[in-house]
Structures are given as structure tokens and as C-alpha cells.
From Swiss-Prot:
Region (Disordered), start-end ranges: 74-105, 113-132
One Gene Ontology MF term: heat shock protein binding
Taxonomic superkingdom: Archaea
Cofactor binding, note field: Binds 2 Zn(2+) ions per monomer.
Organism encoding this protein: Haloferax mediterranei (strain ATCC 33500 / DSM 1411 / JCM 8866 / NBRC 14739 / NCIMB 2177 / R-4) (Halobacterium mediterranei)
Cellular component aspect of the GO annotation: cytoplasm
Name of the protein in question: Chaperone protein DnaJ
Gene3D superfamilies given in the database record: DnaJ domain, Heat shock protein DnaJ, cysteine-rich domain, Urease metallochaperone UreE, N-terminal domain
Self-association and partners: Homodimer.
Length: 384
């Protein structure tokens, strides 16, 4: 992958911000370490993130276009360290004499603070929290009703067990870094469109340690991290809704420089049910009854996610009428009761009638003043 940020995203140098963002989304989806099987996916993903960060920031992009890739990267390499230094420390943009100060947020002062970090001495690496890990799981509505435990397999970076995260064998020879003479820093003078700027950066050869080792760990190749899979037990509480997420602190990737682990986020998807439709914590259900039950009324049993429930259907009930079974819906997440079950009645019109049934319906129609014709039964069907 090319180092140039425009090449990394595959866009032209006059690309709009929207084009850059669209290109970033495609590249990020391709190289995300949780998705891609490429060995260098993580490195490519970081390059894509960095390219997007710079090219969608108007001021950083302007600096990048002016300085070029190499100069811009040198200016940003892990910061120049220390703050507070003024012109006397070699940074013409530091201290109270900063000619670009007082311009408000986002001015040139911010640019040089971001790029050169004030210019002065060494800046110690701060503890950083590890990356979060995302996972998705699908459950049935019955599982969401009762609550359930599931094991999910996650893939994440972990501290290398071979070298305990050091990146080298315990018996490796230790040498003073020849690049920085053991200081852990390198000082360079950078020519910018605004003049010469002195930079003190973390030594790339030793990573700021001031020492190097005779060999790298054979397991992690010096990175101190290895990619592993592990099972995590997920507890989904009763009443969980489709699309909600669970957070498990510390189950993500290990932190850097003593920082805490990242977190694990699990998105729960709930499958559609064959009989019930969910609306928040309420459930919708359609229940069929016979024509006589609709006429005379009846007590019927309707299914719920926790067994059967009795429902009284009053005489003269029409198709489409809705009745409520209180507390027969989904549990509330706070544990305080349940939603309701709303039952829509569907009156089933008989299709095949024997002679007695047909005669009874004719008498029913005549008693109601209906003219008995061949279309009577169809009319009854349409009226129900």
C-alpha cells in the first residue's frame, strides 16, 4: 500500500470531502482487523484511518499539500514533546511570542501545536486504553422473553504469552541504541513554509527506550501482541430488544503503556416470531374464532410466551376487534412487570356447510329480514 494519503484512500488530489469519506468507509470495511484475514490488515487499517483524519481536516490537508507526505509525517512523528518552550528553544511558533496566537480555535497555533507539540523536550508516552471489540449475536423472541446466556467467540489482540508483551526474549542481549545514543530522542531541524523548526521526536529505532535487543520474540515478531480467539459468556437479560448492545468492560484488546484494556460490545438481534409481533414491550397476536363464538361470545385460550392465557370474547364480536391480556407481553428491562398482549380477533367464515348448517343460516337470515338468495352465504362472509 502506498504511503501517500491520497493513494491510500484511492482518491484524486482534488477530491471533495464527501468523496474522501466515502472512500474511507470502503477501505475501512475492507481492512478492519475483525473482518480481514490479511496479515497486515491492522497496519493498512491504521493508514486508512490516518489518511482520513488528515484529508478531512481543512487545515491539516492544506499543510499536507504544502509540505508533501514525507515532511508532513516527520512533523507529526509522535509529537515533538514538551510544552511551554518559546522561541529560545528553537520553535518560532512557541511561547508568548507566537505570531499566530489569539486567532481563536482552529487557527495556525492549533496546527503547529498538533504537528509539533510545542517543540521542547521529550514527551513521555501516556497510557492508552486498548481497542474495543465488537460482536453480534442473534436470539429468538423466547430467549429475549426469559433471558439467556450464550457463548460468543471473539478475535482480538492479546499480550504475547511468550515474551509477556516485551517483544523480545528475556535472555536477549541489550544494547544502547546507536541512533539516539541511549537518549530515546532524536532532534532534527525541519524546513517549513514558515521557517526552520527544530523537532525533538521519539527515536524510531528503539521506540524511545534508548536501547535495542539482539533478537525479536519469535511468536509476536517484536510487537508484543498476538491475535487470539476466545469464548466469552454473554448474559442477555429478560426483555432485551432488537439492536440493543451489551458492554463488557476490559474484554477488549490490551492497552498500551500500562493503559487499561478496551471493552467488548455485543449487539443483540432478535429474530421475528411466527405468531407474535413486538411493539416495545407489548406483543401483537391475531387469534381466529368461529362464527358461533363471535355471535354468542366465548372464553378462548390464546398462546403467550409463557403458556396459555384465557380471553373472554363478548357476544357480537366483529373481525378486527382487539382485546388486551394485561401483563402477557415482554418483561420490562428494569424488572418491574411486563408489557401487554394485544389480541386481534379474526372471525372465520365456514367454507363447507352441511345441510343442517345451511338450513340454520337460512332461518337466521329470514328471521333478520334478509332475502334468502344464493349470494346470502357470500354476503355473510363479507360481513364478518
Amino acid at each position: 500500500m502506498s504511503e501517500d494519503f491520497y493513494d491510500v484512500l484511492g482518491v484524486s488530489r482534488d477530491a471533495s470531502k464527501d468523496q474522501i469519506k466515502n472512500a474511507y468507509r470502503k477501505k475501512a470495511a475492507k481492512y478492519h482487523p475483525d473482518v480481514s484475514d490479511e496479515e497486515d490488515a491492522e497496519e493498512k487499517f491504521k493508514k486508512v484511518q490516518k489518511a482520513k483524519e488528515v484529508l478531512t481536516d481543512d487545515e491539516k490537508r492544506q499543510m499536507y499539500d504544502q509540505l508533501g507526505h514525507e515532511r508532513f509525517q516527520q512533523a507529526q512523528k509522535r509529537g515533538a514533546g514538551g510544552g511551554g518552550g518559546g522561541r529560545g528553544q528553537g520553535n518560532p511558533f512557541g511561547g508568548g511570542g507566537n505570531p499566530f496566537g489569539g486567532m481563536g480555535g482552529g487557527g495556525f497555533e492549533d496546527i503547529f501545536n498538533n504537528l509539533f507539540n510545542g517543540g521542547g523536550g521529550q514527551r513521555r508516552s501516556r497510557p492508552q486504553q486498548g481497542r474495543d471489540v465488537a460482536q453480534r449475536i442473534t436470539i429468538d423472541l423466547e430467549d429475549a422473553y426469559h433471558g439467556v446466556e450464550r457463548d460468543v467467540t471473539i478475535r482480538r489482540r492479546e499480550v504475547c504469552p511468550e515474551c509477556d508483551g516485551e517483544g523480545h526474549p528475556a535472555d536477549a542481549d541489550v544494547n544502547t541504541c546507536s541512533e539516539c545514543n541511549g537518549s530515546g530522542q532524536q532532534t532534527t531541524v525541519q524546513q517549513t513554509p514558515f521557517g526552520r523548526v527544530q523537532q525533538t521526536t521519539t527515536c524510531r529505532a528503539c521506540g524511545g527506550e534508548g536501547k535495542t535487543y539482539s533478537e525479536d520474540c519469535s511468536e509476536c515478531r517484536g510487537s508484543g501482541r498476538v491475535r487470539r480467539t476466545r469464548d466469552v459468556t454473554i448474559t442477555i437479560p429478560a426483555g432485551f430488544r432488537d439492536g440493543q448492545r451489551l458492554r463488557y468492560r476490559g474484554e477488549g484488546e490490551p492497552g498500551e503503556n500500562g493503559g487499561p484494556n478496551g471493552d467488548l460490545f455485543v449487539e443483540v438481534n432478535v429474530r421475528d416470531h411466527e405468531e407474535f409481533d413486538r411493539d416495545g414491550d407489548d406483543l401483537q397476536y391475531t387469534h381466529p374464532i368461529s362464527f358461533p363464538q363471535a355471535v354468542f361470545g366465548a372464553t378462548v385460550e390464546v398462546p403467550t410466551l409463557d403458556g396459555e392465557a384465557e380471553l373472554k370474547v363478548p357476544a357480537g364480536t366483529q373481525s378486527g376487534s382487539t382485546f388486551t391480556v394485561s401483563g402477557a407481553g415482554m418483561p420490562h428491562l428494569d424488572g418491574r412487570g411486563n408489557g401487554d398482549l394485544h389480541v386481534e380477533i379474526h372471525v372465520v367464515t365456514p367454507e363447507d356447510l352441511n345441510s343442517e348448517q345451511r338450513e340454520a343460516l337460512k332461518q337466521f337470515a329470514e328471521a333478520g329480514g334478509e332475502e334468502v338468495k344464493e349470494s346470502l352465504f357470500q354476503k355473510l362472509k363479507n360481513s364478518l
